[in-house]
């Protein structure tokens, strides 16, 4: 009961300290509130295990200790924690740790660490903030876990607990790891440290005292550990290792990321283009051709859409790179400027800028020539093909004679075919092909019309030359008159 009272008092203090921050962050609370509710079981399990299973929580903590021991500052913390006597040493604690660290003391000690360690904490906080933007709601959830009342108290503290402060802070530090936010987090850490002692250090292992993983501020480690907690236990076990690795690796990378975000996100929609151009700008002479090669490869779509027609995309790529090499200085400036207004499309405005900087002779003349050079070849080639494929239509006299012969016999003998070829000034091959085509046409017509085969043959074969030759098939015109409407158009094609 004393613990509960102490916790309540400390929580009230925290709430008072945090109200002014929360007023600013009320609009974020709902969003983060949902996030906290989604932090599934581990939070509640920790709150429920305050009395029953402290050893579970400290197993997590101990795992973190084991992994985190890498950084010297974390070693210091571990020493401090171990030096402090434990209020609750369950057999599991005794097995895993001789003296399980009483969390709250460690948290307080961290706050009182020498200045260099605090600086390290700040750095790590900033880095972890950037890492843990997604995980911040979890950190907040831990503080609610500190309340012995359980999930209900957790939800209440979701509104008041420092994690709301951390959420906005950590989101903003994403690109700018501001010292102010880190200071706020240290305040929160202190608050957590104050809360922890009242909690009989049971909740603490998952809360502020979890920090042994990398001396980085307790809050940050809480974020890491909690982030892993909602991922379920296997992730937690793997987590501390990742925490140390990420804290070490991100120490290098977060600086670069912050640099990219601050400097280049203003101009770019995507971080990948940022990197290439980040290198291209400072060293236009040496590395700018690389940027240019990137440019043509990434920009064919944009070049065609913005400045060029799809017809000479390849042409444009070649000449863009060439023009860029011709005037490295001009193109470097141009390539840097357009992103400001072309963020949605990446580098869509780039080609036009490139042309303007490189000069009309370099860029626009290419634009004019690009489409023209292939076209003449295409026209010549198509012209040749069209000439080859052109078929001189048969004269009316030739078609009429062939139709007459087709009436007598759809299949022409070699003798007759030779005579027709000589009389009509055609080759035998032409005559043969004409009869083949005529038979096919007749067949199709007969299929389309469900009339008798005779009617189809008569109509399809005779209506073309019905006016000219009426000697032997005048009797068919009665049938033709019925079918002429259908076949006239077909036969004269």
UniProtKB/Swiss-Prot annotation:
Family according to the record: Belongs to the Abd-B homeobox family.
Protein name: Homeobox protein abdominal-B
Compositional bias of kind Polar residues: 144-153, 174-184
Protein localization: Nucleus
Short name of one Pfam family: Homeodomain
Gene source species: Drosophila melanogaster
Residues in the DNA-binding region annotation: 387-446
Name of the gene encoding the protein in the UniProt record: Abd-B
Segment forming the signal sequence: none
InterPro entries, per database record: HD (IPR001356), HD_metazoa (IPR020479), Homeobox_CS (IPR017970), Homeodomain-like_sf (IPR009057), HXA10/ABDB-like (IPR046333)
């Amino acid at each position: 009961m004393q613990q509960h009272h102490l916790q309540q008092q400390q929580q009230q203090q925290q709430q008072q300290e945090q109200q002014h921050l929360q007023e600013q962050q009320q609009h974020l609370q709902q969003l983060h509130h949902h996030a906290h509710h989604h932090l599934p079981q581990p939070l509640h399990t920790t709150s429920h295990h305050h009395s029953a299973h402290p050893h579970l929580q400290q197993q997590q903590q101990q795992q973190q200790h084991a992994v985190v021991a890498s950084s010297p500052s974390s070693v210091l913390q571990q020493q401090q924690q171990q030096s402090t006597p434990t209020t609750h040493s369950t057999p599991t604690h005794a097995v895993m740790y001789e003296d399980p660290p009483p969390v709250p003391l460690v948290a307080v000690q961290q706050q009182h660490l020498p200045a260099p360690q605090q600086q390290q904490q700040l750095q790590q906080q900033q880095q972890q903030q950037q890492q843990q933007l997604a995980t911040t709601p979890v950190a907040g959830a831990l503080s609610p876990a500190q309340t012995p009342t359980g999930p209900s108290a957790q939800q209440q503290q979701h509104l008041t607990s420092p994690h709301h402060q951390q959420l906005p802070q950590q989101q903003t530090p994403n690109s700018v790891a501001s010292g102010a936010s880190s200071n706020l987090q240290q305040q929160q850490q202190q608050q957590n440290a104050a809360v922890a002692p009242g909690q009989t250090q049971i909740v603490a292992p998952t809360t502020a005292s979890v920090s042994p993983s990398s001396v980085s501020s307790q809050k940050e480690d809480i974020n890491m550990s909690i982030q892993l907690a909602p991922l379920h236990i296997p992730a937690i076990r793997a987590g501390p290792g990742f925490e140390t690795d990420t804290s070490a690796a991100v120490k290098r990378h977060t600086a670069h990321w912050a640099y990219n975000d601050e400097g280049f996100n203003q101009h770019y929609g995507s971080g990948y283009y940022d990197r290439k151009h980040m290198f291209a700008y400072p060293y236009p002479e040496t590395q700018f051709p690389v940027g240019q090669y990137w440019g043509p490869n990434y920009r064919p779509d944009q070049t065609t859409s913005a400045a060029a027609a799809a017809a000479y995309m390849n042409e444009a790529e070649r000449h863009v790179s060439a023009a860029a090499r011709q005037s490295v200085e001009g193109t470097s400036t141009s390539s840097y400027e357009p992103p400001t207004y072309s963020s949605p499309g990446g580098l869509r405005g780039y080609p036009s800028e490139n042309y303007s900087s490189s000069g009309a002779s370099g860029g626009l003349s290419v634009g004019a020539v690009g489409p023209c050079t292939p076209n003449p070849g295409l026209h010549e080639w198509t012209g040749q093909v069209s000439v080859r494929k052109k078929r001189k239509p048969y004269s009316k006299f030739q078609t009429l004679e062939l139709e007459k012969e087709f009436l007598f016999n759809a299949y022409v003998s070699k003798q007759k075919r030779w005579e027709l070829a000589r009389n009509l000034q055609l080759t035998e091959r032409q005559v043969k092909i004409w009869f083949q085509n005529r038979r096919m046409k007749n067949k199709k017509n007969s299929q389309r019309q469900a009339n008798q085969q005779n009617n189809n043959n008569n109509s399809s074969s005779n209506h073309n030359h019905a006016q000219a030759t009426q000697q032997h098939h005048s009797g068919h015109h009665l049938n033709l008159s019925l079918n002429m409407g259908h076949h006239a158009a077909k036969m004269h094609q």
